[in-house]
């Protein structure tokens, strides 16, 4: 398992360079944000490389629960480098971006490699002070009862993208012998209504 994170500060104050290289990104982000949004900024990127045996299902979580900014104009694109079947793709809980914001997973926040172990509780709260527990409810155990949730996933080809709001509950299906490797690029953008 490998993860690289790059933040936009200093080298992409606005997304112009990225938009010049791939103009369809601007149109897609603008269509998601709506006509009332005037500006689009590049939030940052992540690169994930995951091989079979290097991890199990990435726990469901919301990126917004540990981000220092909020708003409706927040989107991430999950882009695979190889054909990725639905059974091994990103999984998003439909409508979960509408709330509530859950307490992030402690294991995922403190030691992502640990979540490879079987028997790890994927819902253990990261923020455990009494006021934090009241403000942010514990994550639901989606994997224990996936039929109770609107779990969305897709068959994707290289260059396809899944767009999701930072408050969407999402996790990654595991890689295994049937799909032994997954490489993905995540691009994030934000718009006018975001506050820090």
Question: Which residues make up each language-model segment?
Answer:
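A short hydrophobic beta-strand segment most commonly corresponding to one strand
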Residues: 76-79, 94, 179-195
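Acidic, His- and aromatic-enriched active-site or binding-groove loops in soluble protein domains
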Residues: 62-78
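Histidine-centered catalytic micro-motifs
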Residues: 57-65, 168-172, 187
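Non-heme Fe(II)-dependent double-stranded beta-helix
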Residues: 1-60, 66-68
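Short, structured patches in soluble enzyme cores that scaffold and shape functional sites
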Residues: 46, 51, 62, 79-83, ...
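Double-stranded beta-helix
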Residues: 85-169
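Short, charged/polar surface micro-motifs in flexible loops or helix N-caps
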Residues: 52-54, 83-86, 161, 192-194
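Short beta-strand His + acidic residue motifs that chelate non-heme Fe in jelly-roll/DSBH
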Residues: 77, 164, 170-178
């Amino acid at each position: 398992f490998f993860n690289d994170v790059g933040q936009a500060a200093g080298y992409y104050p606005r997304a112009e360079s990225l938009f010049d290289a791939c103009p369809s990104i601007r149109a897609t982000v603008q269509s998601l944000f709506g006509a009332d949004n005037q500006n689009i900024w590049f939030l940052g990127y992540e690169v994930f490389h995951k091989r079979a045996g290097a991890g199990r299902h990435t726990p469901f979580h919301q990126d917004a629960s540990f981000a220092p900014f909020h708003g409706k104009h927040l989107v991430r694109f999950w882009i695979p480098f190889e054909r990725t079947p639905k059974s091994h793709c990103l999984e998003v809980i439909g409508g979960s971006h509408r709330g509530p914001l859950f307490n992030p997973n402690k294991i995922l926040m403190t030691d992502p490699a640990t979540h490879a172990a079987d028997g790890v509780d994927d819902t253990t709260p990261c923020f455990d002070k009494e006021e934090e527990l009241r403000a942010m409810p514990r994550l639901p155990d989606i994997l224990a009862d996936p039929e109770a949730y609107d779990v969305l996933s897709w068959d994707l080809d290289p260059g396809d993208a899944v767009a999701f709001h930072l408050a969407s509950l999402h996790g990654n299906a595991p890689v295994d012998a049937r799909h032994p490797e997954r490489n993905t690029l995540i691009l994030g953008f934000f718009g006018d209504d975001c506050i820090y």
